[in-house]
């Protein structure tokens, strides 16, 4: 399968796949805002979908360039499982938009993780977007390798944009380390997210 994805198909054929992921999901996006998915006659935040995944034991990694807006952060705080289990990093150089589903299918394209990009906004309000949905393993592996290179900080040492980076990926604290060090996790809506890690209080209990 190598399928051209445009406009509303980003919601119907890409975002709709997220709920059925069984093992792993990686998301790369430049911008990140609150977005919603249809549930019966209503809707729910996309974060609720991610919450269900991590509760099932699915590994979810989110890599983004910009700190999310207030609405996103407030929605995040309503899903405690995400605070503990969602893996998230921030790099201001990230401009790719991709999703890799269970290491088997990949979306590579232009749509950010926003309502107008990949969410349920209607025709006439949403962005014009374009991308490819593929199960060609050469492309899937290439996308995953590119994501992982950024995720692991492979480019940090020689990065020329350090003045714009509050905290290099190589120094971002893992959540299991936070728990072991007995730091206090501050709710994300209290202050802005701090460069790819949960805001921390260094007052140990």
Descriptions of predicted regions:
Residues 1-62, 138, 183, 187-205:
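PLD-like (HKD) phosphodiesterase/transphosphatidyltransferase domain
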Residues 36-37, 72-74, 117-118:
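Short glycine-/acidic-enriched loop or helix-start segments at secondary-structure transitions
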Residues 105-202:
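Signature of lipid phosphatidyltransferase scaffolds
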Residues 71-82:
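Short, aromatic/basic amphipathic alpha-helical patches
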Residues 2, 85-87:
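Short, conserved active-site loop motifs that form the nucleotide-linked donor/cofactor pocket
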Residues 97-100, 130-132:
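Short beta-strand scaffold segments in enzyme catalytic cores
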Residues 31-33, 67-69, 112-114:
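Short, solvent-exposed loop/turn segments at secondary-structure junctions
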Residues 89-93, 125:
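Short solvent-exposed loop/turn micro-motifs enriched in small/polar/acidic residues
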């Amino acid at each position: 399968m190598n399928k051209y994805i445009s406009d509303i198909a980003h919601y119907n054929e890409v975002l709709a796949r997220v709920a059925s992921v069984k093992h792993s999901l990686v998301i790369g996006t430049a911008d990140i805002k609150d977005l919603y998915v249809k549930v019966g006659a209503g809707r729910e935040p996309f974060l609720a979908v991610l919450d269900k995944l991590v509760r099932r034991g699915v590994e979810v990694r989110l890599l983004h360039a910009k700190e999310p807006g207030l609405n996103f952060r407030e929605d995040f705080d309503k899903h405690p499982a995400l605070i503990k289990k969602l893996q998230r990093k921030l790099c201001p150089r990230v401009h790719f938009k991709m999703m890799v589903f269970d290491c088997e299918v990949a979306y590579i394209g232009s749509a950010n993780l926003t309502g107008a990009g990949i969410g349920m906004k209607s025709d006439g309000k949403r962005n014009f977007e374009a991308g490819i949905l593929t199960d060609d393993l050469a492309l899937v592996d290439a996308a995953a390798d590119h994501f992982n290179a950024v995720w692991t900080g492979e480019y940090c040492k020689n990065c020329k944009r350090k003045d714009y980076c509050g905290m290099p990926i190589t120094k971002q604290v893992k959540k299991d380390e936070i728990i072991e060090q007995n730091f206090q996790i501050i709710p994300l809506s209290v202050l802005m997210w701090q460069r790819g890690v949960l805001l921390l209080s260094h007052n140990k209990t």
